[in-house]
A protein has these predicted regions:
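Bacterial N-terminal signal peptides that target proteins for export
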Residues: 1-11
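Bacterial N-terminal signal peptides
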Residues: 10-20
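Sec/Tat signal peptide C-region and signal peptidase I cleavage site
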Residues: 22-27
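An edge-strand/N-cap motif at the start of beta-rich repeat modules
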Residues: 30-44
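Conserved anchor residues at repeat-unit boundaries in beta-strand-based tandem repeats, strongest
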Residues: 40-51, 63-74, 87-97, 109-119, ...
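Short beta-strand elements of solenoid repeat domains
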Residues: 55-58, 65, 78-81, 88, ...
Length: 483
């Protein structure tokens, strides 16, 4: 660090006075003499030249009071300069040389070694802003070993070059942070260690005052990063070991996990794949603690897009995902051999889809919340086909069933059974048109037998009930008949 006052000495360096004296005066005699340049000397002479002690004043305000030898300022003295600076100390050849102290008009000062009018060597500088430098100088600039202390608590101890911190040094900041390492052009650069009061510790490369290059960063919370940094942020390849036991190894950008990386959680979860802005995003593979494995697209740390999951029991799903849930179109294969191809919502069959069972049963139709709901076609293992409505997984509403033995029914259904009004055609050719209840003919209906006969009436438990016999009231007795 430099100070404006240190440069002033160059402008105020005393010059040796070459004074022509026409008549020599006895030594130690005090004489006042004025010169053509306006300067006035009052002091002793010897052999016609200033010698001993004297005061010399110039019209510009410069005043020197001190020792003279053979016409030259030499020895101890005090110089007051036009700019208000005051030097008191040793002189040689008209210039400060040796030990001396200069006090500047702004209150700053320097006390220490001088050479040929320049601040050179060891000394202490107090600056107007309250800062203090103790150490080596070269041509009025900090150069060599030195300590700079500021009123706010900032302290630097170490190497200087041409007025700037350069080499090895230690900085103590007002907040208690400490840097110990290399300096270049006044900034932290090279290798160094930074320790913050909250527990953060960084040790590694620095560029332009910022953490850059390879290093190790331990956060206050216990997380540890080892790898590349740029401009104070994690950038490039690195590894984070989190305080909770989790870890990440891979690429970073702008201090965030970005690019390709592997995350391992202490519970057994492992993800390997793409990252963006600190989150799992893109293509990747996740292995879960329960043994499930998902491979596909991710967004915001969750499966999102196209992907396939294989469960521990061997079941799989391959298709669309949204925010971590099975949603969209896909194929689910269960360990039992059941296969569903179709639409999903929140992890359940929902929309149009086809379910095939290993025994040959197939349902192709509408699903709601994992159940058959709406219109669909069910084909059974024995060749029976039902086409119609479903509710809560069972045949309900209007539907038609055709069985391999020739039975055919079209009409109402309830809770999986024929119920309501419909037409049933039996394998023998009989046709019943009427009401049903729980799979039985129940209520009004007509049976047309294959023989051509018909039976029309009320049915119960599948059979035609006998017609009710009318109750005839007894005829009243004739009038006038005696008992």
């Amino acid at each position: 660090m430099t100070h404006s006052g240190m440069g002033r000495i160059g402008a105020t360096v005393l010059v040796a006075l070459a004074i022509n004296v026409t008549q020599p005066a006895p030594a130690q005699e005090v004489i006042t003499k004025q010169y053509e340049d306006g300067g006035i000397y009052e002091g002793t002479f010897k052999d016609g030249t200033q010698h001993g002690h004297g005061t010399y004043r110039l019209p510009n305000g410069y005043v020197y009071d001190g020792d003279w030898v053979a016409g030259e300022i030499l020895g101890q003295g005090k110089a007051t300069y036009p700019n208000g600076s005051v030097y008191e100390g040793h002189f040689k050849a008209g210039k400060p040389d040796g030990d001396g102290k200069i006090t500047y008009a702004d209150g700053g000062s320097y006390a220490g070694a001088w050479v040929d009018g320049q601040i050179n060597g060891q000394g202490v500088a107090h600056y107007a802003n309250g800062s203090t430098y103790t150490g080596a100088f070269r041509q009025a600039l900090h150069d060599g070993k030195g300590v700079m202390e500021s009123p706010g608590g900032y302290r630097y101890e170490g190497d200087w070059l041409a007025g700037v911190k350069q080499g090895k040094g230690k900085i103590t900041y007002p907040d208690g942070a400490i840097y110990d390492g290399d300096m270049l052009k006044g900034e932290r650069a090279g290798q160094g260690k930074l320790t913050l009061p909250d527990g953060l510790v960084y040790e590694g490369g620095w560029v332009g005052g910022q953490m850059s290059g390879q290093g190790r960063l331990k956060q206050a919370n216990g997380d540890v990063y080892e790898g590349a940094l740029a401009a104070g942020k994690r950038q490039g390849q690195g590894k984070v070991t989190y305080a909770n036991g989790d870890s990440y190894q891979g690429a970073f950008s702008a201090d965030q996990r970005a690019g390709h990386g592997v995350f391992r959680a202490k519970d057994g979860y492992v993800y390997e794949g793409d990252w963006a802005d600190g989150h799992i995003a893109g293509q990747g593979k996740a292995s879960y603690p329960d043994g499930s494995v998902y491979e596909g697209q991710f967004a915001a740390d969750l499966p999102d897009g196209r992907g396939k999951i294989t469960y521990k029991d061997g079941s799989t799903y391959d298709g669309d995902w949204k925010a971590g849930a099975i949603e969209g179109s896909g194929t689910a294969t269960y360990v039992s051999g059941v296969v569903y191809i179709g639409q999903f919502l929140k992890g359940q069959n929902s929309g149009q889809g086809k379910m095939t069972y290993p025994d040959g049963y197939v349902y192709d139709g509408t699903w709601v919340a994992g159940q058959r709901q709406g219109a669909g076609v069910a084909t059974y293992a024995d060749g029976t086909v039902y086409t119609g409505d479903f509710a809560k997984g069972r045949r309900e509403g209007q539907g038609e069933i055709v069985m391999k033995d020739g039975f055919h029914y079209k009409g109402g259904w309830l809770a999986g059974e024929i119920d309501g009004t419909g037409v049933a055609t039996y394998a023998n050719g009989d046709v019943y048109d009427g009401a049903f209840k729980a799979g039985q003919r129940q209520g009004q209906g007509q049976m047309r037998y294959a023989t051509g006969e018909t039976a029309d009436g009320t049915w119960g438990d599948g059979v035609l009930l006998p017609a009710p016999v009318p109750v005839v009231a007894p005829e009243p007795a004739a009038a006038g008949t005696a008992n």
